[in-house]
Amino acid sequence: MCIRDRFRQINRFLEFIEDILPQLDKDKEQTIIDFGCGKSYLTFAMYYYLKVLKGYNIRIIGLDLKKDVIEHCNQLRTKYGYERLNFYEGDIASYKGVESVDMVVTLHACDTATDYALAKAVKWGAKVILSVPCCQHEANRTIADETLSPVMDYGILKERFAAIATDGARAKLLESKGYQTQILEFIDMEHTPKNLLIRAVKTGKPDAKAYEEVQNMSRVLNIDLTLKKLLED
């Protein structure tokens, strides 16, 4: 990805964060976790935007599976003096470094990694979830419906349909757990084909109908999503 496209992505993500600022308590330290932070362009930008520009009392934790990347990010945060920004090697499913989190962020967490991040966010009671999914392979492997053969018979259409069905189900499952959700265009397709963002804000009002809708769709399409199973545990 070129620098210009990455810059556009980060700016767009910060716009989504600006929209949810009223959900964050400015008088109390807010904990934010960025799962699959990679080289942490977004993580550093979030810290600067929220801590330096907006004056929020925040702690940001970046998690990634790559040891060398985490070491590099920690060197940078020391260089810039970002004391409440920390990076750890690991995955969100097994991370136990905090008891509660105010906001969970994922940018292109691949396939079911997004599901583990969303499930963890729900269990933490996160007030805000911002997730840009990536590579929804799970549903694509099992999805089937003879009435949709004009779509299913063509690989690229099946892949896109499976991705849309997966993200729609994820949004509905979050609603079933007491979140108000939106699926928004993250950035123009010109810059990345992975251009949908799931934004969820906690309301504390579970929607049982939303869960039933996912159940019905899963049965019709022959899919069994990881997020659904994780939230049932």
Where are these regions (language model features)?
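Conserved alpha-helix/loop element of class I SAM-dependent methyltransferases that forms part
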Residues: 9-28
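Conserved class I S-adenosyl-L-methionine
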Residues: 28-38
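Conserved SAM-binding motif I beta-strand of class I
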Residues: 59-64
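Substrate-binding/catalytic lobe of Class I Rossmann-like enzymes that use SAM or dcSAM, i.e.
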Residues: 134-220
